[in-house]
Amino acid sequence: MNPLTKVKLINELNEREVQLGVAEKVSWHSEYKHSAWIFVGGLPYELTEGDIICVFSQYGEIVNINLVRDKKTGKSKGFCFLCYEDQRSTVLAVDNFNGIKIKGRTIRVDHVSNYRAPQESEDVDDVTRELQEKGCGVKTPPSSPPEVSEDEDAKLTKKHKKDKKEKKKRKKEKTEGQAQAEQPSCSRSATVKEKKDERASRKHSSKTSERAQKSEHRESKKSHSGSPDGRSSYHARAEDPECKARKEKPKHEHKSASRREAEEKSRERERGRSSGTHSGRHRGHSDGRSHRSRSRSRSPDKSHRHKKYRHSRERDSYHGSDRRHH
């Protein structure tokens, strides 16, 4: 089959897989998953191994290359075999490099299922021998630990010591927690009972104090209500506007100036009214007392006059009877 037709067929397969969204496991590339070698044909004769590595190393690290040459002349025959470090690089190389042109020639790239490296012969050059033995992959130097300065080393040691101390503290806390958890249940129940007893005693004492306060308050109310002095003092306290003002002061400290002025005016009015009521009561008591004293003073005069009148009538009647007898 013509190599160009092979290139077209491979490209058509790749396009169909992309359109259908075929998974990697079902793709035709999965048949060559055990081989990391690819075939490259249609190369210009002027290219060397280095040129080919520069082009094909875009999709992975190349481990080995075998550019086929003529044994007599040593010229390349236009095709080679490449081995990648990672097998997935072969899929990328086949999909992307197949059908490209290098120096006006279209190249063909395809998988190789079972490739055997050529055996050593006397005609092989020293360069090809080294490539076949060592490969063309770049050997990375062993990673040496970075140099650490003295300050950094001291900081690291301090951090290490701090970490050790923190670990020891955590271990101690864990051991203490385990020891507390291993305590007998009776000790826990005893502590719980003690706490409950303390709470109950506090509640009982608070209740008894509240009851005593309530009883004292009731007795004081009864004593005030039973005695007239207590009543009068109670009414006086209730009517006293100054006491009300004192009680209302802390509650209404946040009021505005206008409200305070209105309150002062109302207090003055209440004071005037209370003074008027007290004076009226005092006058009423004084008038009642004077009226009683007058009535008492008048009553003995009336009785004395009545006695004199009776005594004069008795005399007149006695003298009249004497005259009749004579």
Curated annotation (Swiss-Prot):
There is a cross-link at K8 (Glycyl lysine isopeptide (Lys-Gly) (interchain with G-Cter in SUMO2)). Signal peptide: none annotated. Residues 117-326 are annotated as: Disordered. One of its GO terms (molecular function) is RNA binding. Residues 191-200, 207-219, 236-245, 255-273, 313-326 have a biased composition (Basic and acidic residues). CDD domains: RRM_ist3_like (cd12411). Its main location: nucleus. Part of the activated spliceosome B/catalytic step 1 spliceosome, one of the forms of the spliceosome which has a well-formed active site but still cannot catalyze the branching reaction and is composed of at least 52 proteins, the U2, U5 and U6 snRNAs and the pre-mRNA. Component of the minor spliceosome, which splices U12-type introns. This is RNA-binding motif protein, X-linked 2. It comes from Mus musculus (Mouse).
